[in-house]
Amino acid sequence: MKFVEIRDLQVTYMGKTKPSIVIDKLDIEEGESVLITGRSGSGKSTLVSVINGVIPHLINAEVKGEVRVFGLDIKTTPTSEISRYVGTLLQDPDTQAFNYTVIDEVAFGVENYMVSREEMINRVEESMKICGISHLRDREINTLSGGELQRTVLASVLAMRPKALILDEPTSNIDPQGTREILELVKTFRSEGISLVLVEHKIERVLPFIDRIIVVESGKIAVDIKKDEIIDRADLLHSLGLEIPDYMLFLKKSGFRRIDYEYLRKTYNYKPPSRNEGKGEILFASVKVKTKSGKYLINTKISLKQGTITALMGKNGSGKTTLLKAIVGLIDKKRLIVEEEKVIVNGKDLSKAKLVERGKYLAYLPQFFDVMFIKRTVEDEVKFSMKNRGVYDEMRLGEILRIFSLDAYRTEDPLVLSMGQRRRVAMASVIAGGAKVILMDEPTSGQDWYHRQILGKELLELRNKGYTILVVTHDARFVDRFTDYLLVMSDGKIVLEGKPEEVFSKSLNHGIEPPLEYELGGLIKNEQFS
């Protein structure tokens, strides 16, 4: 039996006249592992929403053609039945968690199946162990980091024992160590015959764990190849906006049809880009935040140079998001104790300043940014940010929308856009506010390589105009290409700092993997790909 059978599919969202996806034929065999990739907004999420029955049952859209999942017609089969066969990990785990504690969340789906208590306990314990969250069992959901939350949601899906899994950007909010663990789980699922659909922008990460690559472009399947054909098709995939590492293009030009790491280590040279030194300190913060039980979540100092882009990396739960929230004044003081929160921006002491006052100097883009949207159109969202800070200008509004490729979406509701598009709306709104120091929590998450490059280039432009930017990210290649300095956090403290190439030479001990180009080019030693 096939996992997925699609014939003559057209999906048109309510209020739209043009189909979002048009697919003549697509088959996925039971037990097959398939990567679905493509630019942000290309139709990937729509396709998987059809496969798991979310469309048309939960999202109102017209579905023409035939779609069968393990022989079930998705048009007539309720999602409650489809979910017994197909489990889904959504791109934003925050939208998938409903319970108070981790163990309650993992048990929730199984409880709805009314299995025996003994069976439920076994499934929950096994799923938490697989996902490495057993130690979080009694933690409140709202205290988890993004990666911890993602593993919790995945455990809740696994506990339902589906025949197939759809993982929508499963590594987007997880640190490199967590990514390896999740992909090892994928390897385990494959060995057990579970059918897999991975939606992922970063092909390099998942290549060892898949059989096939499907590229969606403008709502259609543009490429459908076996994974061994990736070098042969490297130029085409690159032209479609996919992240094809430089060493793969090098192999293509050298006449290779397969990845040969031994050849690369002998012949491939890599030189990191030049960095900006900066013009002196613009931000200094000394922060101490602890739980009511006395455990320090943050106990560190941070300094940023004016006119630089600094990356902040570290394992999930190391304190990166908490540090940013402390700097901008967003710590929940009913839940946590702020022992010290000294913040100086451009010589002005903001330590006792309220949120609105800090907002004149500091702009903040949160990790889960949908909570920022309060207007019904993209244009009004960005305009509101400008007016709220007293910097509204019509020409500047148009410029910002063009910078972030949002001009065509002026009248769209931000919440109906793809995740990557919504993130660009949030970034445009943050930058439009006028502050000269910008703190971004995972702005690369969920973005395709094309838009990550655009983001990086625009951050460079902002840097060259005098802005100072701090970016929390797990994307080492983005850090290498677009940032000037790199900070690494561990257990609430900054433990490494310097230029990316300096820090990458020491970062493996802290769970930070440099881009593979560093190892292949002889800049560092890493046995992972030997």
From Swiss-Prot:
It is a peripheral membrane protein. Keywords: ATP-binding, Cell membrane, Membrane, Nucleotide-binding, Repeat, Translocase, Transport. SMART domains: AAA. It is found in: Cell membrane. ATP 2 binds at residues 314-321. One of its GO terms (biological process) is transmembrane transport. It is an enzyme of class 7 (translocase). ATP 1 binds at residues 38-45. Residues 6-243, 282-516 form the ABC transporter domain. Its EC number is 7.-.-.-. InterPro entries: AAA+_ATPase (IPR003593), ABC_transporter-like_ATP-bd (IPR003439), ABC_transpr_CbiO/EcfA_su (IPR015856), ECF_ABC_transporter_ATP-bd (IPR050095), P-loop_NTPase (IPR027417). GO terms for cellular component: plasma membrane. SUPFAM superfamilies: P-loop containing nucleoside triphosphate hydrolases. PROSITE patterns: ABC_TRANSPORTER_2 (PS50893). One of its GO terms (molecular function) is ATP hydrolysis activity. Its main location: membrane. Probably part of an ABC transporter complex. Responsible for energy coupling to the transport system. Belongs to the ABC transporter superfamily. This is Putative ABC transporter ATP-binding protein SSO1893. It comes from Saccharolobus solfataricus (strain ATCC 35092 / DSM 1617 / JCM 11322 / P2).
